[in-house]
Amino acid sequence: MKVIIASQNPAKIAAVESAFNLAFPNDTFSFEGVSVKSGVPDQPMSCEETKQGAINRVNNAKIKLPNCDYYVGLEAGIEGNSTFAWMIIDNGLTVGESRSSSLPLPPQVIDEVKKGKELGDVMDEQFNTDNIKQKGGAIGLLTNNLLTRTSVYQQALILALIPFLHPTRF
């Protein structure tokens, strides 16, 4: 089965691959990351805006690569003093969705993001890292790598897969 991931971010791709392989151990998948627009600002600043970005990514991936088995959109955002991400999974018949855990952000990080900077760039500046958003993310930095962007996204993706695990109930 072909799974299209509406991102080329390695951390997001790894999370999707892991979630699908754990949820469906007897199935064989091929995964492809594609670059598509989210239709929202680079740094979404509300739950609604973030969810819409994930939905838009799925819809744009379906246009770019039609006739695949699953489309997955992941969009990270900020609301208040926390960051989180929305997961949308669509197979053309069913849509599964879930929001990740929320990660509190330090006040100085929030201040910079409110000035229009992307969270990943702010984290790189303040923690002297390089391209953290494609690695462990802010989650990895702030939890001392007890959790990573991939591990938290994997959990949310598994939750979004529930309607596909139990199709007769949804």
UniProtKB/Swiss-Prot annotation:
EC number: 3.6.1.73
Coiled coil regions, renumbered to chain: none
Keyword Lipid biosynthesis carried by entry: no
First-level EC class: hydrolase
Keywords: Hydrolase, Magnesium, Manganese, Metal-binding, Nucleotide metabolism, Nucleotide-binding
One Gene Ontology molecular-function label: nucleotide binding
Cofactor section: Mg(2+); Mn(2+)
Keyword Transport attributed: no
BP GO annotations: nucleotide metabolic process; thiamine metabolic process
Cross-referenced Pfam families: NTPase_I-T
Reaction catalyzed: XTP + H2O = XDP + phosphate + H(+); ITP + H2O = IDP + phosphate + H(+)
InterPro entries assigned to the protein according to its UniProt record, in alphabetical order: ITPase-like_fam (IPR029001), Non_canon_purine_NTPase (IPR002786), NTPase/PRRC1 (IPR026533), YjjX_NTPase (IPR050299)
UniProt remark on cofactor binding: Binds 1 divalent metal cation per subunit; can use either Mg(2+) or Mn(2+).
NCBIfam families registered for this protein in UniProt: inosine/xanthosine triphosphatase, PRK05074.1
Subunit structure and binding partners: Homodimer.
Similarity section: Belongs to the YjjX NTPase family.
General function of this protein: Phosphatase that hydrolyzes non-canonical purine nucleotides such as XTP and ITP to their respective diphosphate derivatives. Probably excludes non-canonical purines from DNA/RNA precursor pool, thus preventing their incorporation into DNA/RNA and avoiding chromosomal lesions.
Cross-referenced HAMAP family: Non_canon_purine_NTPase_YjjX
Protein's recorded name: Inosine/xanthosine triphosphatase
Organism: Aliivibrio fischeri (strain MJ11) (Vibrio fischeri)
Lineage, top ranks: Bacteria, Pseudomonadati, Pseudomonadota, Gammaproteobacteria, Vibrionales
